[in-house]
């Protein structure tokens, strides 16, 4: 089932997400719905707060980026209660976008490599080192779990230059090719 993507301005995007308990109802179905929602919106990642749920869950499928970024080939994961164990000091600045901020793309610096621990939808624990663009996707999506969005990482002047677009998103007057839920609509 395709879920609405909550847009910038929705309060759930600014909340610290809660850990997912092992007895969370219909977790596998939620993961499937989030993947379907992400694919429908042509995204490579989606966090639970973006579908209105303040829980620590993200889904990622970077495979579509595999031609340009080989580390993304086959990189499909559901990360439950993810935790960064290490982040490299070396950062790379690249342009990012977000399904919750349609039409906005800005350059953001992120760690080149991260070591992350998480559980999958079968409650199997994983710890892995993720590099390059795949690491960028993981960091971007996990940032949603802390009540932040990528625009928070750009300079005040860049945010000011995007103010009109941000207001359009909040009002719900921005055009979206996917099902979305704005504050003003």
Curated annotation (Swiss-Prot):
GO terms for molecular function: metal ion binding; peptide deformylase activity. It comes from the Bacteria. Pfam families: Pep_deformylase. Gene3D superfamilies: Peptide deformylase. It is an enzyme of class 3 (hydrolase). Fe cation binds at residues 98, 140, 144. It catalyses: N-terminal N-formyl-L-methionyl-[peptide] + H2O = N-terminal L-methionyl-[peptide] + formate. Binds 1 Fe(2+) ion. InterPro entries: Peptide_deformylase, Peptide_deformylase_sf. Keywords: Hydrolase, Iron, Metal-binding, Protein biosynthesis. The active site is at 141. Its cofactor is Fe(2+). Its EC number is 3.5.1.88. Coiled coil: none annotated. GO terms for biological process: co-translational protein modification; translation. The keyword Metal-binding applies. Belongs to the polypeptide deformylase family. NCBIfam families: pept_deformyl, PRK00150.1-3. This is Peptide deformylase. The lineage of its organism: Bacteria, Pseudomonadati, Bacteroidota, Bacteroidia, Bacteroidales. The gene is def.
